[in-house]
């Protein structure tokens, strides 16, 4: 079943501009409170200008362009501007530092980068080492360094015409994005996402929350993540609704923003719900128009009930991952919800619980959650240049092994139990224990290291490191955290450490 009618992203935006014209498409609020608004017509023109900018810089169909940006209008311009000319977006987690960012540049084959002055010094060093294919950097800030190979994104964009200058033939099977996601190995894998994937995601996610063109979908989730892109942005645009993109999450500002923009749909992770609950009660707690809150694992029933009662909202559960593109299991619109179930398989999908021998299990039995979709259409196409990793999780007939455990009941409701992967879920982010261990182990004083997740009342899990030092060495807590801070931002830096004489358990699987 082809629900997108063979329409790629360039056609989508041209049609949206024609149909919705001056209706508000995008509202972006910066951390400083600056608000930018664009109608569907204006947004399509900005996307065209951005596509023309890339063309003048030598970008053609199939070229990869990396984005290292926080939530901002430029992210949206670049995402769809690249898609219009058949180029490929490579979003980089804005919290990553040098080593991980450089690795993604190398392995994605990105030749151009769009970033801000905040991140430029790091990429200047990477560019000088000439270890990647990166040949040019566009900065979204007004002020520019006096360096070769650097230009102003805004200045170049504003010089471009509002009509598209380069329109190569496109197919819905063409790659639109390579999104690198943390895995159980030491390095993230590039998830290949097609035009069809994104178009399908828009229709599917709009169906999941019964989105209409008079809705306002507000998100504070990072644009470099699949949920912001496919559950929120693509859903809003596909429905002709208004998409509100807030740069940074603030528990104190959240409800005021929801009221100001008259949001009707939003999305939350457990960390957000918990931080919203610790805010002082206010008479304005229910002064909003939200009818659905898209929710992603994991929350206790007590926390769920308290949140819904205080703020007068309903949680719509959705389970998925980067490889599934959308929440392939979840609550359905106008259907009964059964807490703590993660819902039922959505349309176009099949779901099973399988044992260690890949055999389906009956209701009530715990096993691996497996999903059947169509690669490149309803689930990801493949891991970029990694057929071995692709074959490990994706069967030839479209069955995807999620690596998560769960069970189902007799009525087809699924229940999440745990992640089989050696992962830590911290504040909505997947953090690989192996990745952290391998890098921390490079410290000259450290003989061995084990990283584990421990329960955290706000972020689900905190990161704890058990360190074994080389004989005769000493390492202070301050020195250890200073070393970690140089490698990672707050996302992956352990919050707790402990120096051990002997490490009995090695989390690397030894």
Swiss-Prot record:
One of its GO terms (biological process) is fatty acid metabolic process. It catalyses: 4-(trimethylamino)butanoate + ATP + CoA = 4-(trimethylamino)butanoyl-CoA + AMP + diphosphate; crotonobetaine + ATP + CoA = crotonobetainyl-CoA + AMP + diphosphate; (R)-carnitine + ATP + CoA = (R)-carnitinyl-CoA + AMP + diphosphate. Pfam families: AMP-binding, AMP-binding_C. Keywords: Ligase. It comes from the Bacteria. Pathway: Amine and polyamine metabolism; carnitine metabolism. InterPro entries: AMP-bd_C, AMP-bd_C_sf, AMP-binding_CS, AMP-dep_synth/lig_dom, ANL_N_sf, CaiC. One of its GO terms (molecular function) is carnitine-CoA ligase activity. Its EC number is 6.2.1.48. Belongs to the ATP-dependent AMP-binding enzyme family. NCBIfam families: PRK08008.1 (NF005947). HAMAP family: CaiC. Catalyzes the transfer of CoA to carnitine, generating the initial carnitinyl-CoA needed for the CaiB reaction cycle. Also has activity toward crotonobetaine and gamma-butyrobetaine. This is Crotonobetaine/carnitine--CoA ligase.
């Amino acid at each position: 079943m082809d629900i997108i009618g063979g329409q790629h992203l360039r056609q989508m935006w041209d049609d949206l501009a024609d149909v919705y014209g001056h209706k508000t498409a995008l509202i972006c609020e910066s951390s400083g409170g600056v608000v930018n608004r664009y109608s569907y017509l204006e947004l399509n023109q900005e996307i065209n200008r951005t596509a023309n900018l890339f063309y003048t810089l030598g970008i053609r169909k199939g070229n990869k362009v990396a984005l290292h940006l926080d939530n901002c209008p430029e992210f949206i311009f670049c995402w769809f501007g690249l898609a219009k000319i058949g180029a490929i977006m490579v979003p980089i987690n804005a919290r990553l530092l040098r080593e991980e960012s450089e690795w993604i540049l190398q392995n994605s084959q990105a030749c151009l980068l769009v970033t801000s002055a905040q991140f430029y010094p790091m990429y200047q060093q990477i560019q000088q080492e000439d270890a990647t294919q990166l040949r040019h950097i566009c900065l979204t800030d007004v002020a520019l360094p006096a360096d070769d190979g650097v230009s102003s994104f805004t200045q170049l964009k504003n010089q471009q015409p509002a009509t598209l200058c380069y329109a190569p033939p496109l197919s819905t099977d063409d790659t639109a994005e390579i999104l690198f996601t943390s895995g159980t190995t030491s390095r993230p894998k590039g998830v290949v996402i097609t035009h069809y994937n994104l178009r399908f995601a828009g229709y599917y996610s709009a169906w999941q929350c019964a989105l209409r063109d008079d809705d306002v979908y507000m998100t504070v989730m990072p644009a470099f993540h699949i949920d912001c892109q496919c559950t929120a942005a693509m859903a809003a645009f596909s429905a002709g609704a208004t998409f509100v993109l807030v740069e940074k999450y603030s528990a104190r500002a959240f409800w005021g923003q929801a009221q100001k923009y008259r949001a009707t749909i939003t999305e939350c992770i457990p960390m957000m719900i918990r931080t919203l609950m610790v805010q002082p009660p206010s008479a304005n707690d229910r002064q909003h128009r939200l009818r659905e809150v898209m929710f992603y694992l994991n929350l206790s029933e007590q926390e769920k009930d308290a949140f819904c009662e205080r703020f007068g909202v309903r949680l719509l559960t959705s389970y998925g991952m980067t490889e599934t593109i959308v929440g392939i299991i979840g609550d359905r619109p106008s259907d009964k919800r059964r807490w703590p179930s993660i819902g039922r398989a959505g349309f176009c999908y099949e779901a099973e619980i399988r044992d260690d021998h890949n055999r389906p299990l009956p209701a009530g039995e715990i096993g691996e959650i497996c999903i059947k979709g169509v690669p490149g259409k309803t689930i990801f196409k493949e891991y970029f240049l990694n057929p071995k990793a692709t074959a490990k999780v994706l069967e030839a007939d479209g069955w995807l092994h999620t690596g998560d455990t769960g069970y189902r009941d007799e009525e087809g409701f699924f229940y999440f139990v745990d992640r089989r992967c050696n992962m830590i879920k911290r504040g909505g982010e997947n953090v690989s224990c192996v990745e952290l261990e391998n890098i921390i182990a490079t410290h000259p004083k450290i003989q061995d290291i084990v990283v584990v997740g421990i329960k955290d009342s706000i972020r689900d899990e905190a990161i704890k490191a058990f360190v074994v030092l080389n004989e005769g060495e000493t390492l202070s807590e301050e020195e250890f955290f200073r070393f970690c801070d140089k490698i990672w931002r707050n996302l992956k830096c352990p919050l707790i450490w402990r120096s051990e004489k002997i490490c009995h358990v090695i989390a690397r699987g030894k």
